[in-house]
């Protein structure tokens, strides 16, 4: 195989998820010491709808992050998976009591997207009451 062709194959592998853009890579990035990197990882994982079985547990863990933005974005991402994230319901119910209103709000919305029986989050839940 020629040198140019090897580079094309390598680039295609990277684009196809075998390299830095793989699900495993982004799950590992949820442990980054940099909060912006963790948020970027949440957003990247949110786009991988066909891999919920691997991603949802990682996002549930991210709901415990020290950073408010990571917790909020994790709740939003879980909601985007809909019923595939039903294992996240207990963790999201816990997040309804988060100290930050934006996290509580995101958790309530996520719960309503995962299971409509949870209904729309009440303003009371968003206030943590």
Q: Where do the model's predicted regions map?
A:
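Sec-dependent bacterial lipoprotein signal peptides
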Residues: 1-16
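Positively charged, low-complexity intrinsically disordered regions
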Residues: 4-7, 73, 77, 87, ...
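Generic N-terminal initiation segments characterized by hydrophobic and/or small/turn-forming residues
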Residues: 7-11, 27, 42, 56, ...
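Amphipathic alpha-helical scaffolding segments comprising HEAT/armadillo-like alpha-solenoid repeats
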Residues: 19-28, 50-63, 83-95, 117-128
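Short inter-helical turns and helix N-cap capping residues of alpha-solenoid HEAT/ARM repeat scaffolds
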Residues: 33-34, 66-67, 99-100
